[in-house]
Amino acid sequence: MQQLQNVIETAFERRADITPANVDTVTREAINHVIDLLDTGALRVAEKIDGQWVTHQWLKKAVLLSFRINDNQVMEGAETRYYDKVPMKFAGYDEARFQREGFRVVPPATVRKGAFIARNTVLMPSYVNIGAFVDEGTMVDTWATVGSCAQIGKNVHLSGGVGIGGVLEPLQANPTIIEDNCFVGARSEVVEGVIVEEGSVISMGVFIGQSTRIYDRETGEIHYGRVPAGSVVVSGNLPSKDGSYSLYCAVIVKKVDAKTRGKVGINELLRTID
């Protein structure tokens, strides 16, 4: 694996000079091998090690390099044709392979090669970009987007129109992460490498980036870039120091544990915020 990483790191340093016409065989094979490993879930751009999320920057570099070594090509899709550098994940799938891998794909859901989809996942008409990891039992609902290299945990529900930010455009240092057993409400956006920790509930229409203030009304604490585990979050505003205006924030209205979540439905958690 170290040899593979060395090839990627070396190629990335000269990425501006690499084209589909001049890329050498060793570099091309290394990049394609990494994309295959990401595609099967054997490698992840980010993973939790000893309780901390670690981003493997060299894998992200391989994803970026894949755009340098491939020309656009015509792709067939139902009644539509596409023209892009990255092939579709399911282009070569037959019924037996879909059954073996154990997830559902509702047309016209789109997944790029290099994204991993785990068993018992349901993809409604949605979009999953290259390098993303979607773990078991997750629902990606209609018009939701899982950005490049984003990490989605087990038993997550991404509601209709949710946007989970990627790392490629604009270039971000770390991927956005939604941990296990989270619910993200319709039309919410979580971007710029924000981590939503396990068991959190994000209400409809909440927007969280690295600069968004995440206000805990019980403690008065303000978080940036991280939603603490078990948080129930709604959109809100905080006043300026002189009270002349207010600015958007996300508000943690309560904390819940796994036992409470098991007894109370998501809608009930969001309704009883007082």
UniProtKB/Swiss-Prot annotation:
Pathway: Amino-acid biosynthesis; L-lysine biosynthesis via DAP pathway; LL-2,6-diaminopimelate from (S)-tetrahydrodipicolinate (succinylase route): step 1/3. SUPFAM superfamilies: Trimeric LpxA-like enzymes (SSF51161). Substrate binds at residues 104, 141. PROSITE patterns: HEXAPEP_TRANSFERASES. GO terms for biological process: diaminopimelate biosynthetic process; lysine biosynthetic process via diaminopimelate. It catalyses: (S)-2,3,4,5-tetrahydrodipicolinate + succinyl-CoA + H2O = (S)-2-succinylamino-6-oxoheptanedioate + CoA. GO terms for cellular component: cytoplasm. It is an enzyme of class 2 (transferase). Keywords: Acyltransferase, Amino-acid biosynthesis, Cytoplasm, Diaminopimelate biosynthesis, Lysine biosynthesis, Repeat, Transferase. Its EC number is 2.3.1.117. InterPro entries: DapD_Trfase_Hexpep_rpt_fam (IPR005664), Hexapep (IPR001451), Hexapep_transf_CS (IPR018357), THP_succinylTrfase_dom1 (IPR023180), THP_succinylTrfase_N_sf (IPR037133), Trimer_LpxA-like_sf (IPR011004). It is found in: Cytoplasm. GO terms for molecular function: 2,3,4,5-tetrahydropyridine-2,6-dicarboxylate N-succinyltransferase activity; nucleotidyltransferase activity. It holds the Pfam family THDPS_N_2. PANTHER family: 2,3,4,5-TETRAHYDROPYRIDINE-2,6-DICARBOXYLATE N-SUCCINYLTRANSFERASE, MOLYBDENUM COFACTOR GUANYLYLTRANSFERASE. Belongs to the transferase hexapeptide repeat family. Homotrimer. This is 2,3,4,5-tetrahydropyridine-2,6-dicarboxylate N-succinyltransferase. It comes from Yersinia enterocolitica serotype O:8 / biotype 1B (strain NCTC 13174 / 8081). The gene is dapD.
